[in-house]
């Protein structure tokens, strides 16, 4: 199977996981998730130098999800990459007391910063690069 086909199949499967998350959590921004999942899969599984094993490496790539309301897709990709168990995310998404909240939460492995307010990702990334 070609690399493109493998990534397309992964994105398709992760879309299903996003739907499971939204149903389990009784809410979410599913349209935004569906629009960004292909980009996240391509970045995390083809382009970026990032894994649960290299989070302390100063040369790792960093990703900031400024479009924080599409967090379900972000969680699905991070879970598929091995940062945390997929079933845990689906079960606990948007539940009281859970770390898997409706915007990226940097208390979770693989998430560089909290986000939600549109537009603050770019200046934060510039600061990280400096």
Question: What residue ranges belong to the model's regions?
Answer:
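N-terminal hydrophobic or amphipathic helices/low-complexity stretches enriched
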Residues: 1-14
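A broad, low-specificity signal for short, low-complexity segments enriched in glycine/proline
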Residues: 1-2, 26-27, 87
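Cofactor-binding active-site loop characterized by glycine-rich and histidine/acidic residues
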Residues: 6, 18-21, 33-130
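N-terminal capping segment at the start of a domain
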Residues: 11-27
């Amino acid at each position: 199977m070609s690399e493109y086909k493998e990534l397309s199949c992964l994105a398709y499967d992760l879309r299903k996981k996003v739907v499971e998350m939204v149903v389990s959590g009784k809410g979410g921004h599913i349209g935004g998730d569906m629009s960004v999942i292909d980009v996240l899969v391509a970045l995390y599984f083809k382009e970026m130098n990032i894994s649960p094993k290299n989070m302390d490496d100063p040369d790792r790539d960093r990703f900031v999800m400024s479009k924080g309301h599409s967090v379900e897709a972000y969680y699905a990709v991070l879970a598929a990459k091995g940062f945390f168990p997929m079933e845990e995310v689906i079960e606990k998404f948007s539940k009281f007391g859970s770390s898997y909240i409706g915007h990226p939460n940097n208390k979770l492995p693989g998430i560089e910063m909290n986000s939600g307010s549109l537009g603050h990702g770019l200046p934060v990334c510039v600061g990280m690069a400096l």
